[in-house]
């Protein structure tokens, strides 16, 4: 059933109440989702995007009930992923000569998915327009890597509607279409979850692209997303939230997550959290077992936090697999402006904590205060864990704290191994079980330093002045300041503004 959006614009998309996995099984869509397609009927009839491929037949049948397919003059594909363009094959089988407007990269993606290079593609770039009659135009805005290289937005003049693609959306299903009609708590939780899990790696691009769009000084009455609600009540609010979230976002919050074999690491997590609360009762603290909790919720909490503590029992001298997988996710999301610490229990060798600490450093976190406990923590060891939490609270505080401790105990920063391990057999410490690792360096290791190298913040490709970039006529010995402004990253195709110096 079509839903009226504004004037001659109607929603002709598909709700998906049952979907629980997205991007394979990487994103849990616990609130379902929607695939938003829009039909514009001015002097020219335009279809913007389709729906997920599994709804192809339903989509085309519903569209035929709304409009004669042969009257569709143009199809605009903002993004070629299958949840946006999945019904193209079913639709184009009926109207094969209808022109498709998309970016150059989208042609490759669409052809790769649907295998119809004969379709009539029209490549568009930022600033290109399409006259649709009645004094109205569509303006196209390329948004590469938000979140695919082929992505773009489409703006409709006069009606002042921005068809924003994945940006500003959320995997959220509701019978109501507009943001002012749905549960606001649910809505904004899903917006933040979406940003944290999908768009965080591209935060710098989000900021740059939003400012580029705002620089056009176009009026805005609605933001029509590809998933979730249409923003009609104060549509600028979600844009301002994106700018906030993209700017090294953090709250006064600490997240702990762990996996454990015998509950020993869980006991450590509980005690550390108690210690944090002793010193800073105002900070929000959440604890998650990665084997039992929703992964995307944990990642959202890490995104919100000023710091994260990651724990694991040692198994085969490495961390437990679910913790390793979570750290791989975190590395890819490239969170900014966050501190981190590793902790964990072990029996004869505590290799997991060392590996976690290294992975956190590699992921760009400022690391401090790793903590190891041997065997099952007793009362003395748990008190060391609490003091570890107190020291974390002091070091990570965003505001002045009361310097008077709740209880006077030995600081874990000064603690060393109580009883050394024998080379032949594990020795138990004097307190029964605990050891505190030496504080780790807070400096992130750099691949190169002091040589003028620049690293792409999106794909991590490194420009080395000693090598230059011959494919773009940048000769060896060319310093970054002398590289032409037209330079593009050879890996992701983005410009100089996404590069940062390697220090």
Curated annotation (Swiss-Prot):
Compartments where located: Cytoplasm
The organism's place on the tree of life at top rank: Bacteria
Ranges in coiled-coil conformation: none
Name of one Pfam family that matches: Rubredoxin
Co-factor remark: Binds 3 Fe cations per monomer.
Keyword Zinc found: no
Binding-site residues, Fe cation 1: 79, 81, 147, 166
Co-factor(s): Fe cation; FMN
Xref: CDD domains: flavodiiron_proteins_MBL-fold, rubredoxin
Entry's Gene Ontology cellular component terms: cytoplasm
Domain Rubredoxin-like: 451-502
GO molecular function, one term: iron ion binding
Metabolic or biological pathway: Nitrogen metabolism; nitric oxide reduction
Binding sites annotated in the UniProt record for FMN: 260-264, 342-369
Keyword terms, alphabetized: Cytoplasm, Electron transport, Flavoprotein, FMN, Iron, Metal-binding, Oxidoreductase, Transport
Region (Zinc metallo-hydrolase): 30-210
Residues binding Fe cation 3: 456, 459, 489, 492
Flavodoxin-like domain location: 254-393
Binding site for Fe cation 2: 83, 166, 227
NCBIfam families referenced in this protein's UniProt entry, alphabetically: PRK05452.1
Entry similarity comment: In the N-terminal section; belongs to the zinc metallo-hydrolase group 3 family.
Oligomeric and partner information: Homotetramer.
Function: Anaerobic nitric oxide reductase; uses NADH to detoxify nitric oxide (NO), protecting several 4Fe-4S NO-sensitive enzymes. Has at least 2 reductase partners, only one of which (NorW, flavorubredoxin reductase) has been identified. NO probably binds to the di-iron center; electrons enter from the NorW at rubredoxin and are transferred sequentially to the FMN center and the di-iron center. Also able to function as an aerobic oxygen reductase.
Protein name (Swiss-Prot/TrEMBL): Anaerobic nitric oxide reductase flavorubredoxin
UniProt source species: Pectobacterium carotovorum subsp. carotovorum (strain PC1)
């Amino acid at each position: 059933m079509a839903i009226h959006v504004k004037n001659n614009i109607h929603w002709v998309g598909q709700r998906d109440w049952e979907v629980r996995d997205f991007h394979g099984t990487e994103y849990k869509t616990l609130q379902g989702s929607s695939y938003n397609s829009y039909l514009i009927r001015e002097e020219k009839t335009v279809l913007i995007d389709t729906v997920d491929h599994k709804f192809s037949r339903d989509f085309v049948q519903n569209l035929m009930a709304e409009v004669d397919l042969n009257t569709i003059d143009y199809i605009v594909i903002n993004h070629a992923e299958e949840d946006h363009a999945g019904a193209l094959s079913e639709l184009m089988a009926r109207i094969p000569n209808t022109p498709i407007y998309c970016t150059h990269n989208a042609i490759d993606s669409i052809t790769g998915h649907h295998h119809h290079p004969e379709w009539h593609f029209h490549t568009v770039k930022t600033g290109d327009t399409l006259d649709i009659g009645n004094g109205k135009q569509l303006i196209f805005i390329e948004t590469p890597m938000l979140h695919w290289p082929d992505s773009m937005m489409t703006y409709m003049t006069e009606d002042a509607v921005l068809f924003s693609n994945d940006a500003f959306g959320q995997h959220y299903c509701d019978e109501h279409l507009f943001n002012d009609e749905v549960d606001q708590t649910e809505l904004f939780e899903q917006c933040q979850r979406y940003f944290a899990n999908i768009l965080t790696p591209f935060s710098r691009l989000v900021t740059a692209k939003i400012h580029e769009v705002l620089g056009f000084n176009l009026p805005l009455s609605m933001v029509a997303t590809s998933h979730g609600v249409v923003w009609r009540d104060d549509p600028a609010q979600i844009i301002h939230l994106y700018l906030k979230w993209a700017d090294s976002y953090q709250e006064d919050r600490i997240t702990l997550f762990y996996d454990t074999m015998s509950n020993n690491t869980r006991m450590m997590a509980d005690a550390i959290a108690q210690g944090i609360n002793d010193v800073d009762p105002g900070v929000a603290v959440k604890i998650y077992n990665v084997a039992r909790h929703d992964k995307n919720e944990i990642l959202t909490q890490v995104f919100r936090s000023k710091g994260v503590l990651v724990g694991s029992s040692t198994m085969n001298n490495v961390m437990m697999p679910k913790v390793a997988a979570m750290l791989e996710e975190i590395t890819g999301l490239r969170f900014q402006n966050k501190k981190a610490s590793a902790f964990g229990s072990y029996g004869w060798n505590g290799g997991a904590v060392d590996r976690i600490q290294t992975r956190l450093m590699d992921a760009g976190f400022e690391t401090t205060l790793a903590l190891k406990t041997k065997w099952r923590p007793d009362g003395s060891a748990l008190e060391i864990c609490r003091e570890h939490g107190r020291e974390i609270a002091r070091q990570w505080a965003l505001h002045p704290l009361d310097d008077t401790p709740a209880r006077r105990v030995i600081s874990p920063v000064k603690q060393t191994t109580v009883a050394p391990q024998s080379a032949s057999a594990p020795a138990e410490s004097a307190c029964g079980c605990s050891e505190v690792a030496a504080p780790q360096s807070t400096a992130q290791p750099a691949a190169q330093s002091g040589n003028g190298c620049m690293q792409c913040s999106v794909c991590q490709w490194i420009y080395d002045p000693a090598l230059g970039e011959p494919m773009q006529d940048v000769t060896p010995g060319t310093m970054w300041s002398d590289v032409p402004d037209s330079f593009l990253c050879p890996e992701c195709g983005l410009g100089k503004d996404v590069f940062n110096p390697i220090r």
